[in-house]
């Protein structure tokens, strides 16, 4: 959901997989 976009911004420069 919205939390996913927040996570993507924080880990934009890193490879971070997040299921939301």
Swiss-Prot record:
Residues 1-20 are annotated as: Disordered. Keywords: Antimicrobial, Fungicide. Transmembrane segments: none annotated. One of its GO terms (biological process) is killing of cells of another organism. Residues 1-13 have a biased composition (Basic and acidic residues). It comes from the Eukaryota. Possesses antifungal activity against B.cinerea, M.arachidicola and F.oxysporum but not C.comatus and R.solani. Inhibits HIV-1 reverse transcriptase and cell-free translation. This is Alpha-basrubrin.
